[in-house]
Amino acid sequence: MKKLALLAFTLLSAWNMDAKTITGPVDYVSPLVGTQSKHALSTGNTYPAIALPWGMNFWVPQTGKMGDGWTYTYDADKIRGFKQTHQPSPWINDYGQFAIMPITGKVVFDQDQRASWFSHKAETATPYYYKVYLADHDVVTEIAPTERAAAFRFTFPDNDSYVVVDAFDNGSFVKVIPSENKIIGYTTKNSGGVPENFKNYFVLQFDKPFTYTAAVANGNIDTNKLEAKDKHAGAVIGFKTNKGEQVNVRVASSFISPEQAELNLKELGSGNVDQIAAKGRKVWNDVLGRIEVEDDDIDHLRTFYSCLYRSVLFPRSFYEI
């Protein structure tokens, strides 16, 4: 009986209970359903995949520690970063992952030190758009994905503001290119079953010049270097921002080469977060709308379309443009 009550609470708490107009099947979807899970007890073992149907890459707010299969749990209260993920389940774990995290004030890289408190009341999660307020840094993060890329928008306070790029700890490389407002690199992080030469190459294109740069090797932040190649590489770049100032970042990756990652970046076109989210919403409505369900109980519709959303995340596209 206790387990049934817990399951009911999990499902109810994961729905967005605010009244809203349903204009398409994607409005029934809650990516948070099934996320109140842990190693000892599963209520779904899901994570909120911010993605397009069958996309090559997904994005997820990361509450779990680096390498933890339970990358997002509903009862967590801190976000460590926003991770590109390819994870099918917590038991299989992830591969080719790296993370981005906006911070303010003191420069930090460590995943615990950079983590920020958040509330579900200040979180919007849909398949095509994610938004959250990071209270400790006073930063709003927004994400809109395409199949191989994503647009980020950070709204910063009046402060010294930074973006951390963490390529994780299985052998990685990160390079800051200030003249191009760009960061490139690769991660080899995986959980097995990959080729010997496996790499996920990534590129981040910013719309604002850097006023601070540092390379990070195994936790050591070095402002005299622009690149790091080590077991655990990363970078921190920064800006002096005014209250409400927005910094846009366009991110793409490739399993083929750095040059291909740059090509995949073109998938975003010239659209901003709002425009890319609108296109993603249409894609989701087109796919989910292939099956029309009628029911007088809105919770049944929410359950059906939330499950259908999960069904069309895989198999993922494994080809590049």
Question: Where would I find each of the regions flagged by the language model?
Answer:
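Bacterial Sec-dependent N-terminal signal peptides
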Residues: 1-21
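Accessory carbohydrate-recognition regions in carbohydrate-active enzymes
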Residues: 20-321
